[in-house]
Amino acid sequence: MRGLLQDVRFALRQLRKNPAYTVAATVMLAVAICANGTVFSWIDGTMLHPIPGARDMSSLVSVMRGQWNSSPTPPFSYLDYRDLRDQNHSFEGIIGYHHDWLALTGGAKPERIYVANVTANYFDVLGVKPLYGRFFRPEEEAAGRSIPYVILSYSLWKTHFAGDPGIVGKPLEIARHPVTVIGVAPKGFVGAAPGLRHDMWMTLDPLGTGGWRTTERSGNWLVVVGRLRPGVSREQANQDLETIMRRIVAAYPNDHLGTNTITLDPMWRSPFGANGYMASTLPILLAIAAMVLLLTCANVATLTDRKSNV
């Protein structure tokens, strides 16, 4: 320990003797460390934890019709989703959702919030437990109510309702329609769309208006995510869903005139969130971070060599 303290004191004396070298080396190292820290933080958030708050994200997959690099439009109707969910043998569960901006009304002025319409098993499949209240029940999935149920995100609950647990059971207004809060999501969970943050969740047909969203196979509007069973690979699950999809297309050919192949990808590659659009930049960011680090090391080494020769 005494030797270590002596080395530290010697190093500090040398740094005081060469303030220009000290400042230059510190600035270069700080820039390199910040650049690399930013890149690797982004990698952690997009690849390792694309859905914060969800259980075992490695078994979650994005279910798409067509290829990843094709136009990322929501690929499934509710009826197709329901058949895929009920007939497969590869998934613990499959969820569907659709998101849009709506107005939180009833206050001094309307405020836009990001609202997701979700299937009733949404939170259960993701492994999320309510902080307060409860989540949706199966019978509430597509059955409308005169006063729909909603679930608040932790952030919206904190910022707009002062973190009051008593908000559960209270009425709100969404786009001038009355709704009832039945639950609050836990801190950290922001939804199943990688890189996006949902403020509120509702059922698929909250007002019970019916129409094409829950009755027509040609109305493709649901983004679909599945959780693989233990021991099932993406390839096996892909074949399973392809088989089901072929049966659906054969039974309803007029409602499936486009591409009907199924593609499963890790959630960080999902084109239905912010991460999907940024995934192609990952190799470029890694290369830039590596170059910055190498150049910094080379510059610091050059400064050190010149200082020692003075």
Where do the PLM segments sit?
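A hydrophobic alpha-helix feature that marks transmembrane segments and, especially
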Residues: 287-310
